[in-house]
């Protein structure tokens, strides 16, 4: 199926849509900006990049275009620790540039937000551990 046909089917009706105050946002995996549009859709596009936090680590995943007919096999994931943030940023920048150049800025922005959220979660946990 073409991505335009899939988008025309799911754009107004899917389980990930969130509407509030006239805005329609999307919470689907692979949607880097959470906008309900074809450019950022993780369901309709053939090429998607997803950056998420799982168990205190950064997980970067992308779709394998050749395996699109097999959804269970169509994701490639790479896990990074929070220690080396520049290495992770370089990986995401290279992946996005080669794979989906129009998503490079969005992928790096999502990576920055995920890494800062993980850092603040660690600091909050460390403060709670102190007792007098």
UniProtKB/Swiss-Prot annotation:
InterPro entries, alphabetized: Ribosomal_eL28 (IPR002672), Ribosomal_eL28/Mak16 (IPR029004)
Keyword field: Ribonucleoprotein, Ribosomal protein
Any one GO biological process: translation
Molecular function per GO: structural constituent of ribosome
Domain of life: Eukaryota
Keyword hit for Ribosomal protein: yes
One Pfam assignment: Ribosomal_L28e
Gene3D superfamilies linked: 3.30.390.110
GO cellular component, one term: extracellular matrix
Entry's family note: Belongs to the eukaryotic ribosomal protein eL28 family.
PANTHER family the record matches: 60S RIBOSOMAL PROTEIN L28 (PTHR10544)
Protein name listed in UniProt: Large ribosomal subunit protein eL28
Organism in which the protein naturally occurs: Dictyostelium discoideum
Lineage of origin: Eukaryota, Amoebozoa, Evosea, Eumycetozoa, Dictyostelia
């Amino acid at each position: 199926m073409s991505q335009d046909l899939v988008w025309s089917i799911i754009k107004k009706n899917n389980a990930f849509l969130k509407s509030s105050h006239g805005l329609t946002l999307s919470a689907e995996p692979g949607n880097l900006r959470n906008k309900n549009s074809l450019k950022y859709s993780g369901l309709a596009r053939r090429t998607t990049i997803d950056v998420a936090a799982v168990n205190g680590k950064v997980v970067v995943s992308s779709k394998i275009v050749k395996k699109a007919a097999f959804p269970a096999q169509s994701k490639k994931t790479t896990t990074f620790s929070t220690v080396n943030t520049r290495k992770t940023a370089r990986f995401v920048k290279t992946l996005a540039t080669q794979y989906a150049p129009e998503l490079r800025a969005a992928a790096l922005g999502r990576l920055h937000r995920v890494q800062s959220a993980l850092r603040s979660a660690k600091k909050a946990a460390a403060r709670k551990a102190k007792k007098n």
